[in-house]
């Protein structure tokens, strides 16, 4: 297993993310999960990541049960405070104590503010809820060894949070892979976090499986260069080449994935610059959808002053893969800035160099959002599941 130094400890470069544990009959397959965690530890993985809502609020319990069979000093456990779910945000003391109990530990090695983003920014930072102050105090007391945050936020929100709180954060977890490097401008996020000297943890390294199932021509291109490397290996090795990435989390769902990933992280085989360029070319070919370049010419003539490129980006993201991020972002906007506020006047389209039928895209996005459960409804469902899990 490859390791990175972090402060005075060695962290496995591969971390076990427990958001996609094996399931049988609609419930977590505890036996297989325990086997996977045992195998992980036997083969050098020492970082385990869970969160309050994972697996219908059952992940913490099963992970805690599995890890409790091992010496506490033999693993590093990360959990997260569900401030992004709003309904749970106002009780940090209650939730933190509950998480410690569910995980059967007296402290968390890493504890993160879960998905600091536009929807929940004010909840996390409002002094009257004392959320951040509470967890800073828990760190002082030794019940949290390292305090950090995960985020799917837009760049301006990330900058704002770091400007205010970087000095009390130990690490940052972002969605990062060779596709989102440009698709979601993860490159800029990586650079911003690095400017604040915060080490980076990676989530969604395979883009929810999108980078596993490449089209045949792309697979053949990679196989011609590294015949014995899988598409999974290419994605991981691209991330290993980023110097500020400390831990790469993988949400493994079965023993086969675990064995494969462990073998990849057994040896460092850096990609050449030419190989990295090939992955960037493959990523560009994967970008289907509305061909917006983000020039913002359309915004100059919009009577509603909509951020059209941002809305189109959310439209493309919704169509590319299942994700809550677009829902959360759009729901954080005032009603008059959402796609449903588009008047359909067409002034924007006449200024678009790509000849995009922008009013039609806004209409389709508004319709699609109306057919999906709101982020608030999703949070309510998660809260109900959490109560049942108690």
Model-derived regions: residue spans:
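N-terminal binding-site loop/beta-alpha segment at the start of enzyme catalytic domains
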Residues: 1-75, 134, 140
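Conserved, mostly hydrophobic/aromatic
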Residues: 16, 33, 40, 48, ...
